[in-house]
Curated annotation (Swiss-Prot):
This is Zinc finger CCCH-type with G patch domain-containing protein. A zinc finger (C3H1-type) spans 157-180. The keyword Zinc-finger applies. PROSITE patterns: G_PATCH (PS50174), ZF_C3H1 (PS50103). PANTHER family: ZINC FINGER CCCH-TYPE WITH G PATCH DOMAIN-CONTAINING PROTEIN. It comes from the Eukaryota. It comes from Drosophila ananassae.
Length: 511
């Protein structure tokens, strides 16, 4: 009975979807038969003959139902094949349409990293092979576009890719190889209208980094087609610049609101903690950029604030608290001066033209009148004068030095050796026992090294007996080596004597 009810529901659904009149008549007849069969089954009071007839009718109904199902399946297969043919034809039409659009300008969407979507002028450069289903459930294709007014680095087209010489693929290249957008999202191209340029008009201006930055118009010269713009933000050293008309793109009210919403969503999206973390990231990025900039900056010989060596250095401490990084230039962007401003003193009674001539005569030296350079020259002159005075005083002889060198010279020579030995003995007595032990080990190593050198020289003498000149040089070298060895052995004996004396004294003081 449940099976008959399910079959009745299937027939009713088929009636709702059927469009052919003949098919509807057959389904209505089948529905009436099923309803009659259900009523007979629920009754349960008929005789066996009626029951047999009903069962026969039920079999007939089952056969008709199976035939109907097969017909429905055939109809669905035919419809599916027709729909596939329609989809193929629709896709071919789409590709033909989009292929004809290659090379045209349009307005394409761009999704930023923070989720905001904005439209920018772009150039269609190709059609993607992949087929997609758009938001309406229809077939669509994707177009590859290059933005003509990129405002962010991920939108900037790769110049090598445009020339066909980029060595990186789309995932590894830092620049854009074209953004993929759906064909249904393409809008009409917005050409720039330079007649709208006026004071305080919002514009996009192209800087040397090939990015387009927002700004406000200060004044316009339509004759020379030049416009002065004040750039937004604090990342530009020269906020007010002159741009030609081809380097500008006037913004409408809707475009300005869209760009403003982008910036506000990128900065104000999230909670206050996220804002603080974003500010920290911006500060860290700023400091990293300044440090990177300092690596490519000319390093002077004198660092900024070197004079604080003689002071407490309060100036550098205050600058560090205000965010200054040592080694970078002055200013918030680190692009200011690195070398300190040197004081200059011009000659007295000379005009500026005469001073310029003097500087040009010195090959345009900027530090020609520098105070620091004059002080350095004066210090060098004083140093040379002191050296000459010392040499002159050392060569100067008087009566007393003459008497000491000539009359008393022999006595001094006789007393020189014992006085030197006495001084050396007194010198050894002033050192500690540990120092004497270290010196003894060092002298012993030197003696062994000197003995090895003497043995090598002796081998050379034995090997070169026929060469007279070489024999003389080797013998002189042998003589010098033996003298040095004798000196080292004498030092070793002196150290041993001093150590033995100290040991004897220690034994005498023991009770």
């Amino acid at each position: 009975m449940d099976e008959y009810e399910a079959q009745l529901l299937v027939v009713e659904q088929a009636l709702e979807n059927a469009t052919d009149e003949h098919q509807r008549q057959e389904l209505l007849a089948l529905k009436e038969n099923l309803q009659e069969l259900l009523s007979l089954t629920r009754g349960g009071t008929e005789d066996d003959a009626a029951t047999d007839d009903d069962s026969q009718n039920a079999d007939n109904l089952d056969n008709e139902l199976e035939r109907l199902k097969s017909e429905l399946n055939d109809m669905e297969a035919t419809g599916a094949s027709k729909s596939n043919e329609n989809e193929v034809q629709q896709l071919a039409d789409l590709r033909t349409k989009y292929s004809s659009m290659v090379g045209e300008k349009c307005s394409a969407p761009h999704e930023h990293s923070w989720g905001a979507i904005s439209y920018h002028n772009a150039l269609i450069c190709g059609v993607d092979d992949e087929v997609i289903i758009n938001g309406d459930g229809a077939l669509d294709a994707r177009l590859r576009v290059l933005f003509t007014n990129p405002t962010h680095r991920e939108m900037l087209p790769c110049s090598y890719y445009l020339e066909g010489e980029c060595r990186f693929d789309e995932a590894r290249c830092r620049y854009s190889h074209g953004a993929l957008v759906t064909g249904s999202s393409i809008r009409k191209y917005n050409p720039p209208d330079f007649h709208k340029l006026s004071r305080s008009c919002p514009v996009l201006a192209q800087l040397p980094d090939r990015l387009w930055h927002r700004g406000r118009v200060l004044c316009v010269n339509f004759v020379e087609q030049v416009c002065r713009v004040r750039l937004d933000g604090q990342d530009h050293k020269e906020r007010e610049r002159d741009f030609k008309f081809e380097e500008l793109f006037p913004l409408t009210t809707d475009q300005e609101d869209e760009l403003t919403s982008e910036d506000s969503s990128s900065v104000n999206d999230g909670s206050s903690d996220e804002e603080e973390s974003d500010m920290d990231d911006l500060e860290a990025a700023r400091r990293a950029r300044m440090v990177e900039l300092s690596l490519f900056t000319f390093k002077p010989t004198e660092k900024l604030g070197a004079w604080e060596e003689y002071t407490r250095g309060i100036g550098s401490k205050l600058m560090e608290k205000m965010g200054y990084i040592h080694g970078t230039g002055l200013g918030s962007d680190g692009r200011g001066i690195v070398t300190p401003v040197s004081a200059q003193i011009l000659p007295k009674g000379r005009s500026l033209d005469a001073c310029m001539e003097l500087r040009e005569a010195a090959n345009g030296d900027k530090d020609y009148f520098s105070v620091e350079r004059k002080l350095q020259r004066a210090q060098r002159r004083q140093k040379k004068a002191n050296e000459k005075a010392y040499v002159r005083e050392s060569q100067r002889t008087d009566v007393f030095s003459f008497l000491n060198s000539s009359v008393l010279g022999s006595d001094n020579k006789q007393q020189a050796e014992p006085e030197a030995k006495k001084a050396k003995a007194n010198d050894l007595q002033q050192h500690s026992t540990k120092t004497l032990n270290v010196e003894t080990v060092r002298i012993a190593d030197d003696i062994r090294r000197k003995q090895r050198d003497i043995a090598k020289v002796q081998q050379s003498l034995d090997r070169n007996t026929g060469d007279v000149q070489l024999q003389k040089r080797l013998q002189a070298q042998m003589h010098n080596q033996k003298q040095e060895l004798a000196t080292l052995q004498a030092q070793e004996r002196s150290l041993s004597k001093e150590q033995q004396t100290r040991k004897s004294k220690n034994k005498m003081f023991e009770f």
